Amino acid sequence: MKMRPLKGLQEKNPTDVIVKDPINITEIKVPVKWFLEKIENKELLLCRTEKCNIWPPDKMSRFIELIYLNIPIDHIYLSERKGRNYDIMSGVHMVRTMYHFYESKFFLTKLEHVYGISGLAYFQLGNNLRNKFLDYKINMKLFRGNQK
């Protein structure tokens, strides 16, 4: 079906994308605790209402299992705003899952490869397992605008 412009509007066919300001993209690895600190300091905001789309507990558990297996996770994309605050461009489910696990808002279920922690929440883990989670490095791409 061909799209027709609204009455009185002319159809435009841009041939080039115009970039307003240069974008600086930095690829870095940061520990899980970096994200948690930013959330706690309100420098990285998550949707906190019940209406937020969240993964089911078994999917969140499988994601946490990847961390304990030390399997690389896809990049999380953030954009930096003025004042060292950040917006999540891509990866909000992953960040929210890490935070919910840290806050012990769910118990690990249906783990296939990691034994001994199924049925537990973060607060029930020993210090070694807590530190392993907090120190796991996440691939992140940080988008910064022109730093004038």
Which residue stretches match the model-derived regions?
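A structured, charge-rich N-terminal accessory region that forms the first stable segment of a protein
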Residues: K38-N41, L45, E50
